[in-house]
């Protein structure tokens, strides 16, 4: 079985590791990831969004199936093109990927099909209408560009924006730049990640995870792609009740069903970013692929073959998935200055043997084959154990064997940081 993987981040290194166990791996990506390269039978350098070139390599190698890692090629219709040319592909079509690539579409779908967990929203193309709506609304808002932003274009009043006046100014900028802007009510609470496999009908849950999007310890600093994440051995999170879990899963199931009814069936991995609000989990946004870092929480403990699951997804015959009852902690290492002004081209020193001795795993990301940093998150160290405390200890021990002009968040997955989140939920719910 020959499988094509598109992408070369930490997420894709985790995908590559599990695919390579059961298939011959072929890769197309924008840079040569050293962790993926050693798993691949062949590796071509090309822009991941250059769909005709990706197709050329897929046909040249005679792959039996393709797996798309990042979101940008999905927006370009890579799944449509590969499938039209006889390559079954795990991932949504361009139309279905709009759940991620067009935030207004996602909000419209939830409203149209009365999907639980939806938020109050409005799309504007007129500056004065937008300003008067925000004034009339009178409560804090969230301002979002409609398209892909790498998780960094969304601004929230009380966080990146001082007040609704600043929100109006930012929204005006976006209307002038993009022609439209999405304004939502601000939802307060604690965020979590719920990823599922789906063949367009059946939805199979993965363990819940929680991401640390802020650059610095204590949840401060600029928003990043994610500085780390954790998951628990019971596959839930310490502040999530069984009822919260069921409601969030129902939102994802209802979304897949709505996509089918809408004539844009969704297959692949669906990622729900939820805010656990006072009354119920609310959708912050959807992603049309695995999370990065959250792929590294779930894939290393997946007991079934990802190749088999992929085949079932493309055949519309998804049977299920099973995960080890283990806790995981992912800690990302980033170049100094990330995300605003990162150092580049500086070599990292990674003692893989020592990392393995600590019981940890390493997944490479924005790093070339000579271990020079390319400007984004460089690599992740993952601890896996029977308890969260032990998984965090392993990840912290492993990360000590990486040297260079780097930083990471020491508080990812720690008892103290999780206790803060539990306390927030209790206070919000008056417990």
From Swiss-Prot:
What this protein catalyses is:
5-phospho-beta-D-ribosylamine + glycine + ATP = N(1)-(5-phospho-beta-D-ribosyl)glycinamide + ADP + phosphate + H(+)
Native species of this protein?
Answer: Thermococcus kodakarensis (strain ATCC BAA-918 / JCM 12380 / KOD1)
What residues does the ATP-grasp domain cover? 107-315
Entry keywords, A to Z:
ATP-binding, Ligase, Magnesium, Manganese, Metal-binding, Nucleotide-binding, Purine biosynthesis
Identify the metabolic or biological route this protein is part of: Purine metabolism; IMP biosynthesis via de novo pathway; N(1)-(5-phospho-D-ribosyl)glycinamide from 5-phospho-alpha-D-ribose 1-diphosphate: step 2/2
Task: Return the PANTHER family for the record.
Answer: PHOSPHORIBOSYLAMINE--GLYCINE LIGASE, PHOSPHORIBOSYLAMINE--GLYCINE LIGASE, CHLOROPLASTIC
Annotated PROSITE patterns: ATP_GRASP, GARS
Q: Which gene specifies this protein's sequence?
A: purD
Protein name as catalogued:
Phosphoribosylamine--glycine ligase
